Amino acid sequence: MTRIWNNHKQTNTPLQRKVFVGMSGGVDSSVSAHLLQKQGYEVVGVHLKCWNKNGCDEKEARDARLVANQLGIPFYVFDMESEYKERVVDYMIDSYRNGLTPNPDVMCNKEIKFGLFLDTALSMGADFVATGHYARLVKEGGKSFIYQAEDENKDQSYFLWTLGEEKLDKVLFPLGDIQKDEVRKILSSKDL
């Protein structure tokens, strides 16, 4: 156990790791934040403002803030709208113009969630970022790999294929080992 020193007094308090959780206000990210808090992480909720067509992003941010308040965790909104347009929307449009079939989810994960969000969170003192993705992280031979989620019907590991090992060492996927039905049960039992 890691020990911390405070005013020259030794304590047996485990060093708490800080995780910034990307929160949409939906079931999966809300339960992810709850599970990480239950595991002893210092959880910070973050809503990524990426696309605010017809005010939908504002509603998601309100919902995420309500959940963060219920969990008693700090909450931030990171405005990434211009970067999202530049790195995801423009990429998608350019790909279509060039006769390609883009996957905006893959690009959003690479550039926004596990690019800009991860970098910003780390610069603010986070040890990890987490999301409500259904995927598993497995360490084998000292290397990190993405594996299919336990719930094959919800698996999102395909959308994360661009993440290199240096990023995988800084991310958590708390829902990777559980079924969606269990996630819903957790949500209703916690009244989030």
Language-model features, listed with the residues they occupy:
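ATP-dependent adenylation/nucleotidyltransferase module used to activate substrates
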Residues: M1-W161, L172, D181-V183, S188
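His/Asp/Glu-rich metal-coordinating catalytic cores
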Residues: G164-K167
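Adenine nucleotide phosphate-binding catalytic loops in nucleotide-utilizing enzymes
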Residues: G176-D177
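Short, intrinsically disordered, charge-balanced linker/junction segments flanking boundaries
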Residues: K190-L192
